[in-house]
Amino acid sequence: MKLNKYIDHTLLKQDAKKKQIDSLLSEAREYGFASVCVNPTWVEHAKKGLEGTDVKVCTVVGFPLGATTSAVKAFETKEAIQNGADEIDMVINVGALKSGNLALVESDIRAVVEASGDKLVKVIIEACLLTDQEKIVVCQLAQKAGADFVKTSTGFSTGGATIADVTLMRETVGSDMGVKAAGGARSYADALAFVEAGATRIGTSAGVAILKGELADGDY
């Protein structure tokens, strides 16, 4: 198994410096990860830094709270793609889901899907804040809205990916969508366990350590 191609090599910290982003890009080139995941302000820089490789540029929309309007999320998506993004990780409107406003949750996702054109859209459900039933419902809504992936977590809330959540999400969406586990893999064994549970991507800042068989510091 080429585990490197499961990994979105991630740096989303608000205080990330250019030299840290450059290090992320260098590691991505060396290890051939699926993508780098960076904040929108770094997308153009990342695209240039990955020219000549097959590493994709992933960015985040409505991040990390998901509480911006659908129009803002759509604008963020379009601008990110103009700047070179290949993949969009968007955060759902968690408050709307919790309030039972499922129509808003679905239309919010659909707004990003439509703005993305042919680019990949991953829907962050922030599983740590949801009941199992809410996880099932929002995965179904993401599927209905035409998204490509469901993703467990932002890494900025109360918890990251769990095996139980990845298993439930995979059971819900079947084989039609990708499932991304984010914020829970700190070792090769962790990453492998998520893949075996049904994850097709792993979002982590510890990609290099994982591939080296080391235990990473940090929680994303």
Swiss-Prot record:
What GO CC annotations are associated with the protein? cytoplasm
InterPro entries registered for this protein in UniProt: Aldolase_TIM, DeoC, DeoC/FbaB/LacD_aldolase, DeoC_typeI
The principal location of this protein is cytoplasm
Query: Where does the source fall among the domains of life?
Result: Bacteria
Instruction: State the reactions this protein catalyses.
Output: 2-deoxy-D-ribose 5-phosphate = D-glyceraldehyde 3-phosphate + acetaldehyde
Q: Which GO terms describe its molecular function?
A: deoxyribose-phosphate aldolase activity
In short, the EC number is 4.1.2.4
Under the heading CDD domains, the entry gives: DeoC
Which one Pfam family would you cite for this protein?
Answer: DeoC
Question: Active-site positions, per UniProt?
Answer: D89 (proton donor/acceptor), K151 (schiff-base intermediate with acetaldehyde), K180 (proton donor/acceptor)
Quick one: which pathway? Carbohydrate degradation; 2-deoxy-D-ribose 1-phosphate degradation; D-glyceraldehyde 3-phosphate and acetaldehyde from 2-deoxy-alpha-D-ribose 1-phosphate: step 2/2
Tell me which Gene Ontology terms the entry assigns under biological process.
Answer: 2-deoxyribose 1-phosphate catabolic process; carbohydrate catabolic process; deoxyribonucleotide catabolic process
Q: Where in the cell is it found?
A: Cytoplasm
Alphabetic keyword roster: Cytoplasm, Lyase, Schiff base
The positions making up the signal sequence are: none
Record family assignment: Belongs to the DeoC/FbaB aldolase family. DeoC type 1 subfamily.
The record describes the protein's role as: Catalyzes a reversible aldol reaction between acetaldehyde and D-glyceraldehyde 3-phosphate to generate 2-deoxy-D-ribose 5-phosphate.
Name under which the protein is recorded: Deoxyribose-phosphate aldolase
Organism source for this protein?
Streptococcus pneumoniae serotype 2 (strain D39 / NCTC 7466)
Q: Which gene encodes it?
A: deoC
